[in-house]
Amino acid sequence: MTETPLNLAYSPSYFARDYEATLRRQAALGIDLVARHQPITLRYGKDPAARLNLFVPESTAGPWPLMLFIHGGYWQALDNTATDFLAERYLARGMAFTSLGYGLAPETSINTMVNQCLEGIAAACNALADNGGVWSIVLGGHSAGAQLAYWVAASDDIPIDKLILVSGVYDLTPLVDTYVNEALELTPTQALALSPIFADSSKLPPCQVVIAENDPPTFRQQAHDFVAALKTSHIQVELVDIANCDHFDVLDAL
């Protein structure tokens, strides 16, 4: 990444304490959990990255509330296992948990990523139907995953009961002139069309928008602007600002 002012403004790692250590720690926690609590692993579609891990509570019988989570990585990095570590806290609450994966840029477009996430959610729900069932669905996403989660919920194809968007990107238009777009290759028109803040949000479920104290200021401002837009659309929305966290370790506080 060339350290231009605009690139730095949209670089979460620039504002983070030690993002590489955080990602390593979270990955290790996920590996440890998988060793202790074997998930159901499913693939959907032809893309090798379109896969999920479904963790089912062992202490309670279904049907269960289901938490689905879409990882970040600016649409071009990481995979579903990056969020496996989150499953432990939801299992402790008696919830099933799914880490969703999707194909990455430049091979996969953002619209295709959304469709893959929809396929993954359907696969998870079908798998749970054979193992006790689902009685409510919460969908979460982090960073780029928050943008994908928004479009999944806005599609109205899956009955989402609550949306949790963490340190998300809600206006993609500034990214067109940044390093992020080297893989995405978005035109200004495409970036506008993919931006949740400019979309019709009237059918969204209740929404929680989470930001970290040490998120990039651009991300924090986007979150505030997005919440204001949702309120204008009469969506039930809560802004949660988590202190002493950055863009990466904010997931530890969920």
PLM regions: where:
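C-terminal catalytic histidine-bearing segment of alpha/beta-hydrolase fold enzymes
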Residues: 220, 224-227, 231-254
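Alpha/beta-hydrolase
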Residues: 70, 166, 242-245
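The feature captures the conserved acid-bearing segment of alpha/beta-hydrolase catalytic domains
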Residues: 162, 168, 175, 188-228
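Catalytic nucleophile-loop/oxyanion-hole region of alpha/beta-hydrolase
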Residues: 78-87, 98-136
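Short, surface-exposed "cap/lid" segments of acyl-processing enzymes
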Residues: 58-90
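N-terminal cap/lid segment of alpha/beta-hydrolase-fold proteins
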Residues: 4-61
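Primarily recognizes the serine-hydrolase "nucleophile elbow" in alpha/beta-hydrolase
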Residues: 119-183
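Glycine-rich His-Gly loop
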Residues: 70-74, 143, 168, 212
